[in-house]
Amino acid sequence: MQLTVKALQGRECNLQVPEDEQVSTLKQLVSEKLNVPVRQQRLLFKGKALADGKRLSDYSIGPNSKLNLVVKPLEKVLLAEGTARRLADSPPPPVWHLISKVLARHFSAADASRVLEQLQRDYERSLSRLTLDDIERLASRFLHPEGTEAMEKGLSK
């Protein structure tokens, strides 16, 4: 099938690909035609970003479809890759190590491990549920503790 890939800067190319082609393969073809490195590409179809591991058919992309190409700045790509690498290489936070020591004093090794895993899951779930308002409130309390103390005293009267 014939596809048109249009970059936001105005350049575009036409590509002939099978309907079940991998998005990652399409990105490689775009790289060859438009000289945009694969890692800087973000392909969009009807406003939705295409994932590398999926096929064009997963997004119902048919013949003569038009895809948009967003070119990510190299600095952002390198920063994101560096951050991901640091996170993967970093040891668990010291707090989890301390908690595991405390649990080891009160539970068997197997039970302590299960309790720690459940605690970490609960913690991650709680963090993922925080709204921007919640985060803003927490930040305000840390940045202006005297203001929140006054508000809490006023509310408790």
Curated annotation (Swiss-Prot):
<feature type="region of interest" description="Required and sufficient for interaction with BAG6">
    <location>
        <begin position="96"/>
        <end position="138"/>
    </location>
</feature>
<dbReference type="GO" id="GO:0051087">
    <property type="term" value="F:protein-folding chaperone binding"/>
</dbReference>
<dbReference type="GO" id="GO:0071816">
    <property type="term" value="P:tail-anchored membrane protein insertion into ER membrane"/>
</dbReference>
<keyword id="KW-0539">Nucleus</keyword>
<dbReference type="InterPro" id="IPR019954">
    <property type="entry name" value="Ubiquitin_CS"/>
</dbReference>
<keyword id="KW-0597">Phosphoprotein</keyword>
<comment type="function">
    <text>As part of a cytosolic protein quality control complex, the BAG6/BAT3 complex, maintains misfolded and hydrophobic patches-containing proteins in a soluble state and participates in their proper delivery to the endoplasmic reticulum or alternatively can promote their sorting to the proteasome where they undergo degradation. The BAG6/BAT3 complex is involved in the post-translational delivery of tail-anchored/type II transmembrane proteins to the endoplasmic reticulum membrane.</text>
</comment>
<dbReference type="InterPro" id="IPR041421">
    <property type="entry name" value="Ubl4_C_TUGS"/>
</dbReference>
<dbReference type="InterPro" id="IPR029071">
    <property type="entry name" value="Ubiquitin-like_domsf"/>
</dbReference>
<feature type="domain" description="Ubiquitin-like">
    <location>
        <begin position="1"/>
        <end position="76"/>
    </location>
</feature>
<dbReference type="InterPro" id="IPR047154">
    <property type="entry name" value="UBL4A-like"/>
</dbReference>
<feature type="modified residue" description="Phosphoserine">
    <location>
        <position position="90"/>
    </location>
</feature>
<dbReference type="Pfam" id="PF17840">
    <property type="entry name" value="Tugs"/>
</dbReference>
<dbReference type="InterPro" id="IPR019956">
    <property type="entry name" value="Ubiquitin_dom"/>
</dbReference>
<dbReference type="Pfam" id="PF00240">
    <property type="entry name" value="ubiquitin"/>
</dbReference>
<keyword id="KW-1017">Isopeptide bond</keyword>
<dbReference type="GO" id="GO:0005634">
    <property type="term" value="C:nucleus"/>
</dbReference>
<keyword id="KW-0832">Ubl conjugation</keyword>
<dbReference type="GO" id="GO:0005829">
    <property type="term" value="C:cytosol"/>
</dbReference>
<keyword id="KW-0813">Transport</keyword>
<protein>
    <recommendedName>
        <fullName>Ubiquitin-like protein 4A</fullName>
    </recommendedName>
</protein>
<dbReference type="InterPro" id="IPR044724">
    <property type="entry name" value="Ubl_UBL4A-like"/>
</dbReference>
<feature type="cross-link" description="Glycyl lysine isopeptide (Lys-Gly) (interchain with G-Cter in ubiquitin)">
    <location>
        <position position="48"/>
    </location>
</feature>
<keyword id="KW-0963">Cytoplasm</keyword>
<dbReference type="GO" id="GO:0006620">
    <property type="term" value="P:post-translational protein targeting to endoplasmic reticulum membrane"/>
</dbReference>
<dbReference type="InterPro" id="IPR000626">
    <property type="entry name" value="Ubiquitin-like_dom"/>
</dbReference>
<dbReference type="GO" id="GO:0071818">
    <property type="term" value="C:BAT3 complex"/>
</dbReference>
<comment type="subunit">
    <text>Component of the BAG6/BAT3 complex, at least composed of BAG6, UBL4A and GET4/TRC35. Interacts with BAG6; the interaction is direct and required for UBL4A protein stability. Interacts with USP13; may be indirect via BAG6.</text>
</comment>
